[in-house]
Amino acid sequence: MTNSLRLLRAVAGLLAWLSTPVFAQSIDPSFYYKLSTQFRGDGMKLDVFNGGPKNNLTRLEPDQDVSGQFWRFVGNGDGTFRLSTLFRGPGMCLDIFNGGANNNQPHLVRCGNFTGQFWNIMVSESGDGVRLTTRFRGPGMCLDIFNGGVNDNQPHLVNCGNLTGQLWTLTKTDKRVEGAP
């Protein structure tokens, strides 16, 4: 390999690293996180339905020490992350429904090479939270929270805007991912 080619590869690698959102660079894959929104506050965390017609869909629930509220972020090597829970394990990833009654709502499914499972974490313009988007729907659709109705407190992707339901806080816990370095 020529020196020019080595230099070009090194520069490309550096540029890829620099283009990764600053917040994404600080995710520690060895620990679980809890997720909350500015809209509902720190006392409500993202959790997973266990059973029934909404099995594996997500919702905000009061903060508890339950495995469905512990989220793991695993980098894909391109600045995106797969999200899984302690509850369902690393084989079930957060994905987005494409169509139907639950269109644009996140749910846990078997992990695979699906762009709905590739999540971007972008620091908000104000710097007081992060926005969560997927490669599937693109940077113009942000994870927000239903306010009222049958889906109250459940997340869904909507057009990004200046809404506190789209400003998420990722709180690192002291719970280590088993087998993580």
Residue ranges and their predicted role:
Residues M1-V11:
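Bacterial N-terminal signal peptides that target proteins for export
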Residues A24-P181:
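Lectin-like carbohydrate-binding module/patch detector with strong preference for beta-trefoil
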Residues S19-P21:
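N-terminal signal peptide c-region/cleavage motif recognized by signal peptidases
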